[in-house]
Structure formats: structure tokens, C-alpha cells
Amino acid sequence: MLVVDDDPDIRELLFTALEDDGFEVVPAGNGEEALAIMKTFRPDVIVLDLMMPVMDGWQFANELRARDEGDEDIPLVLLSAARDLKTHAKALAAADIIEKPFDLSELLPKIARVASAA
């Protein structure tokens, strides 16, 4: 699983919680870093913040979907404090959406459901 978020506290929280749930987790601080990681690691699921510096979640998702490397079908779980998340999710063909601030007790089952379907 790839967790992409520019907030180090959120990255650490998700990394720890998902590892405790048995997932292999690789963190990234922005979309550019995530694409570099994906040269050597193919995640089953990508947990993706939409608002980040350098390369935001929109840019990352669009680049991922345009690639011809077998990565375009990886499910995305979007994280965002932005409103109108359903529009974002539909535009990016996301598997699920999670509004910030989030509750781990709601977030973890959603991610597990997406991962089990991947």
C-alpha cells in the first residue's frame, strides 16, 4: 500500500495503523515522490491526499491513469479536507473517499475493503 500525504503526522499515523493491521505500507510526501517509489514498488492500493505541494493528488492520479505500465488500475482512496469529494472521486475514478479530519475507526475498514477487492 502506498500512502501519499504531505503532512508527516498523518503519514505516520496511517503508516502505523495500516502496518498494525497487517499491510505493507510505503509512505510518500507528494505525488512526485510517489511516482519515483512506484518505479520499484507496485502497491495494491494508493491512499492519496489531494492537496499537496510539488505534485498534488490530482496531478498524480492523472499521470498514474495515463501511464502504460499496468498501474492505471490501482485503486485510489482519496483523502481531502475539500468539499464536494464525490465529484473528485468520480473524476479520478476513486475506489473510496475519506474526508479530513478522519476517524481511524472509519478509515481503516474502508481501506481494508478496497484492498481486499484489489
Language-model features: where?
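Hydrophobic/aromatic residues positioned on beta-strands within the core alpha/beta folds
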Residues: 77-79
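C-terminal output helix
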Residues: 102-113
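Charged docking surfaces used in two-component/phosphorelay signaling
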Residues: 12-20
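Short hydrophobic/Thr-rich beta-strand motif most characteristic of the beta2 strand and flanking loop
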Residues: 22-29, 37
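Active-site beta3 strand of CheY-like receiver
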Residues: 41-47
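Receiver (REC) domain active-site loop signature in two-component systems and cognate sites
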Residues: 52
